[in-house]
Amino acid sequence: MTDTLDLDRAVAALTQGGVIAYPTEAVWGLGCDPRQRAAVMRLLEIKRRPVEKGVIVVASSVDVLRDWVDIDALEPARRRDVLTSWPGPHTWILPITDRAPRWVTGEHDGLAVRISAHPVVAALCGAWGAPLVSTSANLAGEPPARSRAALDPALLATIDGVVDGETGALAQPTQIRDARSGQILRD
């Protein structure tokens, strides 16, 4: 059985390069420290997801991501759209700086970012104080888990713990929009 982690133990696991599962707005997510290449590569290996696809990161505020994203490069109206949508279930592709790691952005010239209002995600990001990878807790191509009970036992056996809680009310994972163009990339 995979350990249930309180916030302090979740932060300790993340600090040590661990991969954890936690509920998000619609589905269960897997997370790790995106600043640690080995942690991200382990998470991608668990999911069988190619690094070229990149990952979403969640954070307690956009300020936590200033080294990686250049929100000021957006037109004022677009920047306002992004900032007024947070915290909330909105994932935006933001322009990156040259310090954004390729193991996080993949082959893209932007970074997918969400400042979540989901209570578990918000509490975890607040306790962690840094960006956190947020990708669905499933193998690539498989349906995402909507409950802890639906998490694949084989996947659970490969991670370092679970932060308990309930998913939010969204029926689908969050919409992804390009902040530069406003284009919807995932609906």
Swiss-Prot record:
Q: Which UniProt keywords apply?
A: ATP-binding, Cytoplasm, Nucleotide-binding, Nucleotidyltransferase, Transferase, tRNA processing
The EC class name is: transferase
Q: Which GO terms describe its biological process?
A: regulation of translational fidelity; tRNA threonylcarbamoyladenosine modification
GO CC annotations on file? cytoplasm
What species was this sequence derived from? Xanthomonas axonopodis pv. citri (strain 306)
Report the superkingdom from the record.
Bacteria
Q: State the function annotated in the UniProt record.
A: Required for the formation of a threonylcarbamoyl group on adenosine at position 37 (t(6)A37) in tRNAs that read codons beginning with adenine. Catalyzes the conversion of L-threonine, HCO(3)(-)/CO(2) and ATP to give threonylcarbamoyl-AMP (TC-AMP) as the acyladenylate intermediate, with the release of diphosphate.
Which InterPro entries does this UniProt record tie to the protein?
DHBP_synth_RibB-like_a/b_dom, Sua5-like_dom, TC-AMP_synthase, TC-AMP_synthase_SUA5
Q: Which Pfam families match?
A: Sua5_yciO_yrdC
Q: Which compartment or compartments is the protein found in?
A: Cytoplasm
Could you tell me one molecular function GO term of this UniProt entry? double-stranded RNA binding
Q: What is its EC number?
A: 2.7.7.87
Principal localization reads cytoplasm
Q: Which PANTHER family match?
A: SUA5, THREONYLCARBAMOYL-AMP SYNTHASE
Instruction: Determine if Transport is one of this entry's keywords.
Output: no
Q: Which family does it belong to?
A: Belongs to the SUA5 family. TsaC subfamily.
* Reactions this protein catalyses: L-threonine + hydrogencarbonate + ATP = L-threonylcarbamoyladenylate + diphosphate + H2O
Where in the numbering of this chain does the YrdC-like domain appear? 4-187
Q: Where are the transmembrane segments?
A: none
> What's the name of the protein?
Threonylcarbamoyl-AMP synthase
Establish whether keyword Transferase is in the entry.
Answer: yes
